[in-house]
């Protein structure tokens, strides 16, 4: 009997841990504002990375690339069904209609930032590699999943 209880407790624990606690505990407003803040932070860090790469300050740019990568992973949990509208969201319905595609793009953007941190060590054209591995992901997402502004 004790073993059955432990198994049930374990299943319940795994079930609840499979959902990101912070996203479940937040209000719709907090989720929408949180994702907007992360995207804004990514953009600001992207601009800083451009400046640092232009100045050949590669090592200073790498932590910003890691931060952007981490934000993209976190953003996967910031688009629950109940956050399609409100609080000046610019997210289009296509996010939820094509959730797998959107999630794949967020994961690719995250992975590409890690690739960028490695690629800058040997790249001859830093601007081109940044465009390929960073800005092109922004463009791909905005053109498909963000309202024009």
Which residues fall in each region the model found?
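Boundary of Sec targeting at the N-terminus
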Residues: 24-26
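N-terminal signal peptide c-region/cleavage motif recognized by signal peptidases
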Residues: 18-22
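Bacterial N-terminal signal peptides that target proteins for export
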Residues: 2-12
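Sequence context surrounding c-type heme c attachment/ligation sites in exported
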Residues: 28-149
């Amino acid at each position: 009997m004790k073993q059955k209880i432990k198994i049930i407790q374990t299943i319940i624990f795994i079930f609840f841990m499979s959902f990101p606690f912070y996203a479940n505990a937040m209000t719709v407003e907090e989720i929408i504002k949180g994702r907007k803040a992360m995207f804004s932070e990514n953009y600001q860090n992207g601009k800083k990375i451009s400046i640092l790469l232009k100045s050949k300050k590669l090592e200073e740019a790498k932590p910003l690339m890691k931060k952007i990568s981490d934000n993209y992973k976190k953003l996967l949990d910031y688009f629950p069904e109940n956050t399609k509208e409100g609080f000046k969201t610019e997210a289009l319905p296509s996010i939820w209609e094509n959730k797998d595609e959107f999630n794949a793009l967020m994961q690719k953007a995250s992975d590409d930032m890690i690739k960028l941190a490695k690629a800058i060590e040997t790249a001859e054209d830093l601007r081109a590699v940044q465009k390929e591995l960073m800005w092109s992901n922004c463009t791909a997402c905005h053109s498909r999943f963000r309202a024009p502004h």
